[in-house]
């Protein structure tokens, strides 16, 4: 049976040359914790918990009066990103017990960076184990992906525990993907007057962009801000103002997506899809007028039963659901107020214990500044 989980306690780049160095660095870093004071660098953001209603300059000042900003994190994407940036290279962080800790270090910094934006609401969304409704529609969905490496399978539960220790709500629902949770919470929040930031590198979220919804994509450099905003206007420029974000579902349905094994329509690539959508608007209208499509190969493919069926199936696969419910309860997935940022129930000490276990001195120091221990 499908079930929802909301798990919470409230709410760089460095290397250690050896585990011994890591351990001694941590001991120095956490000494005198309560006496520490925020550095000048963090002086403007150290009150992220104490003043959780503030949103700072998260949207360049255009939501300051509304004071409602929800950040939703595509949880697994950052686990993979951190893993292939650290542990998979074989030269990442380890603690004295020999545990790889680079992913945990990276994830802790990501959470701290997001809290420093001073959102009013925050959650990390993960996929549940098992197949989803998309696999029921198309058994080959994501079948081209290699198996998840064993070390990565080992670190995912540790990341989830760290998120909980940092007091951030962790969301998952069996039978659907994290994308659908993000889509549902985004739609609900935007309808309720929030501004929403979706933290992910995944282009599938383009379809959710609106004046109230942007993406925060990982920065391509290690300098400056860790995230790069991607807005509706950025999307329009990327696609030569030919389509709007809501049409991106139809675009992917036409061209396919090899990363998720979405078939698309044979003979229709990006250079063909954009003019089609600019002229006809959506898949349904394109198929209804397939005989008038310019270009013999695309026209014949769209007129064929196989091509039309593939277009319809592909659209259903790439569309992010925005209306999830909990079937067993027959009610909306989760109240937005459950995602409100608030001081950790234990004043941040569970996270400090985790940092001590994994010997992440720098992460501990940053956490102290954010939570004001």
Question: Which residues make up each language-model segment?
Answer:
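N-terminal chloroplast transit peptides
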Residues: 1-32
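N-terminal mitochondrial targeting presequences
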Residues: 30, 38-52
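Low-complexity, acidic/Ser/Thr- and charged residue-rich accessory regions of DNA metabolism proteins
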Residues: 47-69, 316-373
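Domain-level signal for Mg2+-assisted phosphodiester chemistry and nucleotide/NA-binding surfaces
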Residues: 49-169
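Extended two-metal-dependent nuclease catalytic cores across DNA- and RNA-processing enzymes
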Residues: 93-94, 143-328
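Hydrophobic alpha-helical scaffolding
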Residues: 97-100, 149, 266, 276, ...
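Short acidic/polar active-site loop segments enriched in Thr and Asp
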Residues: 120, 271, 361
């Amino acid at each position: 049976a499908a079930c929802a989980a909301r798990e919470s306690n409230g709410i760089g780049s460095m290397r250690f040359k050896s585990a011994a160095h890591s351990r001694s660095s941590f001991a120095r870093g956490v000494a005198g914790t309560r006496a520490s004071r925020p550095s000048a660098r963090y002086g403007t953001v150290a009150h992220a918990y104490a003043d959780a209603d503030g949103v700072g300059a998260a949207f360049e000042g255009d939501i300051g009066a509304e004071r409602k900003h929800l950040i939703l994190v595509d949880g697994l994407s950052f686990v993979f990103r951190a893993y292939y940036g650290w542990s998979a290279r074989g030269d990442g962080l380890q603690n004295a017990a020999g545990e790889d800790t680079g992913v945990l270090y990276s994830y802790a910094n990501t959470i701290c960076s997001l809290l420093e934006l001073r959102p009013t609401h925050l959650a990390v969304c993960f996929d549940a184990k098992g197949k989803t409704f998309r696999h029921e529609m198309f058994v080959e969905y994501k079948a081209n992906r290699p198996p998840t490496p064993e070390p990565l399978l080992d670190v995912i539960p540790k990341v989830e525990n760290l998120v909980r220790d940092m007091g951030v709500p962790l969301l998952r629902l069996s039978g659907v993907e994290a994308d659908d949770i993000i889509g549902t919470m985004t739609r609900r929040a935007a309808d309720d007057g929030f501004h929403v930031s979706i933290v992910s590198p995944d282009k599938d979220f383009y379809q959710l962009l609106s004046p109230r919804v942007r993406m925060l994509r990982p920065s391509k450099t290690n300098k400056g801000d860790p995230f790069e905003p991607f807005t509706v206007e950025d999307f329009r420029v990327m696609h030569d103002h030919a389509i709007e974000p809501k049409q991106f579902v139809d675009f992917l349905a036409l061209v396919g997506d090899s990363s998720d094994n979405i078939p698309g329509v044979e003979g229709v690539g990006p250079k063909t899809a954009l003019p089609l959508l600019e002229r006809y608007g959506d898949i349904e209208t394109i198929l209804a007028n397939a005989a008038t499509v310019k270009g013999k190969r695309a026209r014949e493919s769209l007129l064929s039963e196989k091509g039309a069926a593939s277009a319809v199936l592909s659209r259903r696969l790439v569309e992010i659901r925005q209306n999830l419910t909990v079937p067993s309860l027959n009610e909306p997935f989760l109240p937005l107020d459950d995602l409100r940022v608030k001081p950790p129930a234990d004043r941040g000490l569970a996270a400090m214990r985790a940092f001590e276990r994994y010997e992440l001195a720098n992460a501990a120091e940053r956490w102290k500044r954010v939570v004001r221990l």
